[in-house]
């Protein structure tokens, strides 16, 4: 008769089928697991370093924006009192100078146009 056993609907035959791990395989598996754990910890450490640097840079940006906001608040308070802060005055005078330079470059020079119109009129 057949020496096979029925377990959970499957027929199992006696004997050594498949691969049984040897002690060497267990040691190798344990070493691979340890190496994988070391690599995982290293990746985790790098990820946390990156995140900490990101947080610190964002905190610096927030501080700079808060200082800028405070400066603008002070400018607004000064203008409410009828004073024009020197920084705004410098910005305004700088814009006026830029506009005057742009206006002078847009209009052609008078000497060239007069010469051209005179030569046309003379013909």
From Swiss-Prot:
Region (Disordered): 1-24, 93-123
GO CC annotation: nucleus
Domain bZIP: from-to ranges: 23-86
Similarity comment: family membership: Belongs to the bZIP family. ATF subfamily.
GO molecular function, one term: DNA binding
Basic residues composition bias: residue spans: 10-21
UniProt xrefs under SUPFAM superfamilies: Leucine zipper domain
Keywords: Activator, Differentiation, DNA-binding, Nucleus, Phosphoprotein, Transcription, Transcription regulation
Entry's localization field: Nucleus
Subunit architecture: Interacts with CREB1; regulates CREB1 phosphorylation, stability and transcriptional activity.
Function of the protein: Probable regulator of CREB1 transcriptional activity which is involved in adipose cells differentiation. May also play a regulatory role in the cell cycle.
Polar residues: compositionally biased ranges: 114-123
Mod. after translation: Phosphorylated by AMPK.
Native species: Rattus norvegicus
Region feature (Basic motif): 29-60
Name of the protein: cAMP-responsive element-binding protein-like 2
Segments of this protein annotated with the region Leucine-zipper: 62-69
Endpoints of the signal sequence: none
Pfam families registered for this protein in UniProt: bZIP_2 (PF07716)
Gene Ontology biological process terms in this record: cell differentiation; positive regulation of D-glucose import; positive regulation of DNA-templated transcription; positive regulation of fat cell differentiation; positive regulation of lipid biosynthetic process; positive regulation of peptidyl-serine phosphorylation; protein stabilization; regulation of DNA-templated transcription
Superkingdom per UniProt: Eukaryota
């Amino acid at each position: 008769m057949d020496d096979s056993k029925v377990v959970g609907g499957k027929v199992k035959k006696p004997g050594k089928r498949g691969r049984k791990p040897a002690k060497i395989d267990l040691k190798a598996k344990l070493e691979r697991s340890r190496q994988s754990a070391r690599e995982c910890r290293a990746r985790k450490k790098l990820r946390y370093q990156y995140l900490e640097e990101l947080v610190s840079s964002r905190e610096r940006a927030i501080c700079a924006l808060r200082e800028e906001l405070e400066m603008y608040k002070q400018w607004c308070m000064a203008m409410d009192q009828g004073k024009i802060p020197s920084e705004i005055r410098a910005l305004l005078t700088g814009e006026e100078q830029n506009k005057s330079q742009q206006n002078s470059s847009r209009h052609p020079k008078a000497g060239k146009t007069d010469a051209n119109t005179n030569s046309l009129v003379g013909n």
